[in-house]
Each structure stands twice: as structure tokens, then as C-alpha cells.
A protein has these predicted regions:
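Membrane-embedded helix-loop-helix hairpins and adjacent transmembrane boundary segments
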Residues: 1-540
Length: 540
């Protein structure tokens, strides 16, 4: 039965998100001094600590974190919660490893995307274009999973159809992302992160009330499924699963492009430090808390999986329906829908930047043409809208098991970008040949093993992908580094198109700045000096 009471909180939330996107866009237009591209794709590098932390958390915490993960915890037990605890490290590692270096490098280069940095460091259009392609492919897979998860949850709780849910929240997220750009996405992410926390608290209260309190729930679980109390769940949580999931959703998430680009958008080191500390606490409470609720729901949903539709993705929707009155259920689903929205909006912006900044604008710069801001604005918004529409169409026929789709995309992005980004920022001897071999070889190995179901010692295929990518990165770079250094020594000044050059002619200087969306800057003698300065650079 259709429920207006369950629908109303969702509509109110979406309306607030849209209003925030519009206001953020107008503020950005007034405050921006770096052109449309810098404003639309990285918010003119102006994020404060709270917004920085919340936009990163909301981007990382997808609908899988609220639906698929807790559903698995209902099936496995507290072992899944112990595995999820590694997500506490996500922001700490991201900001600690990438935060300062990426901010310094991107400011000196005038870079607004991860691909900009890769292109400048390795002097390779092929590598940059391949990076953009991989981003779009894996981001699209992730976005489909978010659309499906959000629409399924909406349908289950409100009683409206799956397609109606897809139209309402899918249409809303595409519209406000198109309007708001990076700044709008960042501010709506802060709203989404807050909504996720509220949703967790409401659901926790509902589960504890319906189950007769924490002690009664634990007694029920102990009586019905004693193995759920054990770390290894009598074989359901082998050590190999712990190890590989810790790599996949914890340690190596620092290299996900959608998270790394946040390191280009913050205002100063104070924002970075405060975001690191507060964000680590919030993401820990959020990810451990919502996964633990999945386990506790086994004290309320005591039947077998077939009774709940045969999929773990149905567990949290069923828990919300059975534990909460309709109006509170509407508030509770705002949390996971916010998780879906925040992830989709961030991935849409990153995918749009791959087309506009990394492919189209770069090609125009190669041909000596500048593109007016008005044209860039229209094109960026049209691409964002078109990508959202394509993902929407793909989500109409929903795939099953959302968390598996999400983990596949995580693994592909980590394999492709981990060693390429680390080599770019921290290893002088990394070469474009090594980066190409790493990205191509590692990604192909990962995808082939996933398709064939091939594992080594029961470990997830991410281990194979990362290992192959690492060996190729180091081996090929060492073989080609001497030649690369010799070539570098012949360069008097960098010829990277990512870096706006200081040109004596005023009209050319203005055109270059307009095309890149940044102010003209004086270029050092070598891009290597930007990435590996003799004296440590200071970010104020």
C-alpha cells in the first residue's frame, strides 16, 4: 500500500538538497576567482574542515554500506562487523598519504582532476586518456548499484514502485548535481552525511525496541545462531576474507579517484587536520554502527533468507518496515538514500570532468583553441545530465547483490590507480611506461580473474590485481628510468598541457587561463620540480 507518510520525509530531504545545490552554485559564482572549470569541478579549493570531512565520508559511504553490508552482517554475524571496522582507517590514510602532496601539486599545476596530475607527471596523453576511460567505466558500474539500491529501498518502505523510486530520487540527484557542480555536491554531501547519522540512530532505536532491548536481542541470536557470535562464524568468515576485505574497503581506499579529488578542494592545512580527526571518528561510528545493526536485526528477523526475498539486500528494508512506524520509516530510509545520492553525485562530477577537462579541453589546448566559460558551463552540465540519464536507464532492470557490484568497482579502481598515483607523487623513478604497464596489466588481470572466478589461496582477486600492477610498475619503471631521466634532462621547460604557461603576449595568456579555468602561473624548469622539490613545500 502506497504511503504518503513514508514518502514525505524523502521528498522534503530531496527538496532541501536541491535548494542547497542552487545556493552553493550562486555563492560559487560570486566567490570564484579561478574560472568555471576550477569552480565546477573542485569548488575553487575552498572547502572547510566540516564540509571536507562530510563530503569524503558521504562519497565513501555508499548505499552498499547501508544495505548490502548490513545484510551480509545479518547472514554472517559479528565477524562481518569486525571486518567492517577497518573502514575507520579510510579518511586517515587518504588525508595522511594523499592530502598534502596532492593539494600542493594540484595548486602548482593548476590541476582540477586526478587525470590532470597523472598527465603532467608522466607526460603521457595515452595514460591520461586511459585513466579517464577507466574512471568512467568503473564509476558507471558503481552508480548503477547506487541507483538500484536506493530505488529498491524506496519501493520496499513506501510501497511505491521501483521505477517510481528511481524517477524520484534518481532524477533529483542528477538535477542537483548538474546545477550545483562540485561545491553543490560537497555541501549536499554534508547534508547527506548528517542524514546518514540520523538514519542510523532512528533504525537503532527501532531495532532495540522491536527486539525487546539489547540483551534480549543477543539472547535470541545466541539461541538461534550461536556461530554469529564468533569472529570466524564457523567458517563463514575465513581469515582470507578478513585479509582481502581489509585491503579492499580499508587500506587501499586512499587511492580511489573520487576520494583523491577531495584532496584538491580544501582550503588550508587547518581544514585538512580537522577533517582528518573529526572525519575518522564519524566514519568509524557510522560504518561500524550500521554494520552492527545488520547483525542485531537477526534478533528481529528470525526466519531464513528465503522468507525475505532470497537476497541480503532485502534485510535492511524489511527491518525498517517491521521495526518502525510509517513516518519514522520514512525518516530512516533517508539515511541510505542519502548515501546513494552522495556517492552518485560525486561520481557524476568526476565522470563529467573526465570527458570535459581531461579529454575535450585538453584536445582543444593541443590545437591552440580556447573554449569560453559559457560553452564549458553548458557542455559540463549537459555531460553530467547525459551520464546520469544513461545510468538511470541501465538501472531500470536491476542487478542483484549490490555490495558485490560495489566491491568489484572498488577493486578495479584501486588496481588501476594505486601504484600509478603513489609513483607519481612519491617515486622519482616511476616512468610512463611503468605506469601504463601497471594500469593496463593490473586491471586486465583483475577483471579476468573476477570473470573466471580465479583466486589464489582463497583470496579476493584484488590481491592478484594489486600484485600484478605493483610488479609491472616497479619492474618496467626500473628498466626504463635511465632513458626517462635522460629525456628529462633535455627539457628546458615543461611542455605539459596541464600546466598553463606564462606567455608574454597578454591575449594568449588570457586565453590559456580561460581554457584551463585557472590563473596564469609561472612554470618551473621541470614538472619534476613540482612533484619532487629540493625544499619541502608549505601549504598554508
Amino acid at each position: 500500500m502506497n504511503s504518503l507518510a513514508g514518502l514525505l520525509p524523502v521528498i522534503v530531504f530531496l527538496a532541501i538538497a536541491l535548494a542547497i545545490a542552487v545556493v552553493a552554485r550562486r555563492r560559487g559564482e560570486r566567490a570564484s576567482s579561478g574560472g568555471f572549470i576550477a569552480e565546477y569541478f573542485i569548488g575553487s579549493r575552498s572547502l572547510g574542515p566540516f564540509v571536507l570531512a562530510m563530503t569524503t565520508i558521504a562519497t565513501y559511504g555508499s548505499v552498499s554500506s547501508f544495505v548490502g553490508g548490513p545484510g551480509q552482517a545479518w547472514n554472517v554475524g559479528f565477524g562481518w562487523v569486525y571486518m567492517a571496522a577497518v573502514q575507520v582507517t579510510a579518511l586517515f590514510l587518504l588525508y595522511g598519504i594523499m592530502g598534502k602532496k596532492m593539494a600542493l601539486v594540484s595548486r602548482k599545476l593548476g590541476a582540477v582532476t586526478v587525470v590532470d596530475v597523472i598527465r603532467a607527471r608522466y607526460h603521457s596523453n595515452l595514460l591520461a586518456n586511459l585513466s579517464a576511460l577507466i574512471i568512467v567505466v568503473f564509476f558507471s558500474a558503481t552508480m548503477v548499484a547506487q541507483f538500484v539500491g536506493g530505488a529498491k529501498l524506496f519501493s520496499a518502505v513506501t510501497g511505491y514502485s521501483y521505477v517510481a523510486g528511481l524517477l524520484i530520487f534518481g532524477g533529483a540527484v542528477v538535477v542537483f548535481t548538474t546545477i550545483g557542480g562540485f561545491r553543490g555536491v560537497a555541501f549536499t554531501d554534508a547534508l547527506c552525511g548528517s542524514a546518514m547519522l540520523v538514519g542510523i540512530v532512528v533504525l537503532a532505536a527501532g531495532i532495540l525496541t522491536a527486539g525487546g532491548g539489547y540483551t534480549a536481542i543477543m539472547d535470541t541470536i545466541q539461541a538461534n545462531h550461536p556461530e554469529m557470535m564468533k569472529p570466524f562464524a564457523d567458517g563463514k568468515m575465513p581469515l582470507s576474507l578478513y585479509f582481502t576485505q581489509w585491503l579492499l574497503v580499508g587500506i587501499f581506499t586512499f587511492c580511489l579517484p573520487q576520494s583523491v579529488v577531495r584532496c584538491m578542494g580544501y582550503k588550508d592545512t587547518r581544514a585538512l587536520r580537522h577533517a582528518m580527526t573529526s572525519g575518522t571518528v564519524i566514519i568509524g561510528a557510522m560504518m561500524i554502527g550500521v554494520t552492527a545493526l545488520g547483525t542485531l536485526s537477526a534478533g528481529v528477523l528470525t526466519g531464513d533468507l528465503a522468507e525475505y526475498g532470497g537476497s541480503v539486500d532485502n534485510i535492511i528494508p524489511q527491518t525498517i518496515i517491521r521495526c518502525l512506524p510509517t513516518w519514522l520509516a520514512g525518516i530512516a530510509i533517508v539515511g541510505p538514500i542519502a548515501a546513494s545520492i552522495s556517492t552518485v553525485s560525486s561520481l557524476l562530477i568526476a565522470s563529467s570532468s573526465a570527458f570535459i577537462k581531461d579529454l575535450w579541453m585538453h584536445r582543444a589546448q593541443q590545437m591552440g583553441r580556447s573554449i569560453p566559460d559559457t560553452t564549458l558551463a553548458r557542455a559540463s552540465q549537459c555531460i553530467t545530465l547525459a551520464l546520469g540519464a544513461i545510468v538511470f536507464v541501465l538501472a531500470i532492470v536491476p542487478p542483484d547483490v549490490i555490495w558485490k557490484i560495489n566491491m568489484f568497482a572498488f577493486g578495479g579502481l584501486e588496481t588501476a590507480f594505486c601504484w600509478v598515483l603513489l609513483g607519481a607523487l612519491f617515486w622519482r623513478r616511476a616512468t610512463k611506461q611503468g605506469a601504463l604497464a601497471s594500469m593496463i596489466g593490473g586491471t586486465l588481470a583483475y577483471c579476468a580473474c573476477m570473470a573466471a572466478g580465479f583466486k589464489v589461496a582463497g583470496l579476493h582477486q584484488i590481491v592478484i590485481g594489486l600484485s600484478v600492477a605493483f610488479v609491472l610498475m616497479v619492474g618496467v619503471s626500473l628498466l626504463t628510468s635511465s632513458r626517462a631521466r635522460a629525456h628529462e634532462n633535455t627539457l628546458q621547460r615543461t611542455t605539459s598541457h596541464t600546466v598553463p604557461r606564462k606567455i608574454p603576449d597578454k591575449r594568449s595568456d588570457t586565453a590559456s587561463a580561460q581554457a584551463s579555468g585557472t590563473k596564469p602561473t609561472q612554470v618551473p624548469d621541470s614538472v619534476q620540480e613540482i612533484f619532487f622539490p629540493d625544499k619541502p613545500a608549505v601549504l598554508r
